[in-house]
Amino acid sequence: MGDNLVYAVRSSEGFYLKRGLGKDAVTVFEQNKTSRDVACNVFAYSNNGQLFAYCDNQVTRVFEIATNKEILCVELKRTRKILFSPKDNFLLTFEPWAVYGPKTAENQKPEPNVRVYSLADGKHVSTFSAPKEASWEPQFSDDESLAARMVGSEVFFYTNMSFDRYDHKLVEKGATNFALSPGPAPNHVAVYVPAVGSTPARVRVHRVSESFPVVGNRTFFKSDKAVMTWNQRGQSLLILASVEVDKTNQSYYGEQSLYLINIQSGESVVVPLEKKGPIYAAKWNPNGREFAVCYGYMPAKVTFYNPRGVPIFDTIEGPRNDVFYNAFGNIVLICGFGNIAKGKMEFWDVETKKEIISIEVPNTTLFDWAPDGQHFVTCTTAPRLRIDNSYRFWHYTGRMLAETHFESPKELWEVRWRPMTGYNKFAIKELTKTDKMAAGLPIRKKDASHPLNNVPAGAVRQAGAYIPPHLRKPLGGGGSAGPPSAAAPTPGNQNQRPAQPRANGNGNAPQPFRPQQSEQERKAFQLKKKVEEIKVLKQRVANGDQLQPNQMEKIQRENEYLSELSKLTI
């Protein structure tokens, strides 16, 4: 299982690539550099997974993974970022922006810090300057016919990967960032302008052409930055707007709001959120037909929406702050990482909206789905945590396959999967009791001979609710637990008054014993609740209120609920 998967590990001891997840993993490439002065600072795969690039503080090098054939090697010691163009025809490198020479020199100009190389022949193609590391990357159309980058508040568009002279220019006064749409032509570009004084912030979407016509627009207040995310088809745009300081002092995270622009209709809507609080994550499903939002004060909520911004499903609240879809969009992970040390991970079937399994992997700082959509890696990395660094491979059923630990002072920095094609969407299996018992981290005991040592957490039952001794089932069996009043009177004490229930700490008598509801009773209760909700919705319609599409759909299913309820109550 996962024998063909390839992954790269970068640590304080260098880096290596391996194929396979278990003990039989084969080393594909390895470079051991024990000195931090020559450690690997950055690596990257090409989009098709055939090439691997890295910088080890000596050179920047690109080679073929399958053959180890060197494609490019240049003396760039300070490379901090590496980017492959969408079709892997070009490589871009970024170095920190710096000015060389005497500080008193006149007309000082920084050295160009972004270089473009052709991977077909290894030749240097172009060079330009990018002052900010956060926004150095040019953005490309999928066919590489178009490249765009921002200079000041202007977006320059280039063709043929030549950054010496732009072909088109879009000017938006005060703009701070942009997002070029993926998908087939015509491409669109979204540009964000922060709020200034009484002037609201805005996002404008232009069609890329000589005239740059506006096809979408959204204005909003309380925003000094925005993250814009296109769906895979380039037809819808999510805008996560935020302001760093919450003037009401209710949130450490500032204030956030979420908007959606549909390019085909030109409509823009506010994405409705049922709970107040910060927005931790908003991500598109790779299929482009839905997106998930994690939001609200802890315990946080996760809601799924269709491309029109209408809620279609939400989960119960819990300790989570991120979501991750797998490559096929049929499994989504809802998790709490980073400052949520518990590391709870919930895997959901996207189509059926049912939870597959839930496990806990504490102190997780890095997560990555494998290209097959079934495996994933969890890591504890430096500098976030400098002790107990490790990486673990898992199957989506919650079963751990392998783990590797780094003893202090060794540090783990990064683990990434190699992109690979040839995998197809798979059917999600329904877990058996045995599958669930094999899920979770193995329990570690100081005593290696302890019977629970190395037993998966799923095999250990959670402690049940406390049952007072007088309600417990007798050890000899026979007879069920029940309240004292149900017991037969003791001979010789027939005239004794029955004992009154003893008050608890707050002076109130304890609640009487109630038997647990059966599955049929629970279903009937839920159906009755839905029928009552439908009655309220019908009354709102009679009063002339406008209902949401999902509320109208609920009303249409009234007969279905009544039919199911009648079957359960017969």
Swiss-Prot record:
Residues 493-518 have a biased composition (Polar residues). Residues 519-541 form a coiled coil. Residues 468-526 are annotated as: Disordered. Residues 482-492 have a biased composition (Low complexity). GO terms for biological process: positive regulation of gene expression; regulation of translation. InterPro entries: TIF2A (IPR011387), TIF_beta_prop-like (IPR013979), WD40/YVTN_repeat-like_dom_sf (IPR015943). It holds the Pfam family eIF2A. GO terms for molecular function: mRNA binding; ribosome binding; translation initiation factor activity; tRNA binding. Keywords: Coiled coil, Initiation factor, Protein biosynthesis, Repeat, Translation regulation, WD repeat. WD repeats lie at residues 274-316, 318-358. One of its GO terms (cellular component) is cytosolic small ribosomal subunit. Functions in the early steps of protein synthesis of a small number of specific mRNAs. Acts by directing the binding of methionyl-tRNAi to 40S ribosomal subunits. In contrast to the eIF-2 complex, it binds methionyl-tRNAi to 40S subunits in a codon-dependent manner, whereas the eIF-2 complex binds methionyl-tRNAi to 40S subunits in a GTP-dependent manner. Belongs to the WD repeat EIF2A family. This is Eukaryotic translation initiation factor 2A. It comes from Caenorhabditis elegans.
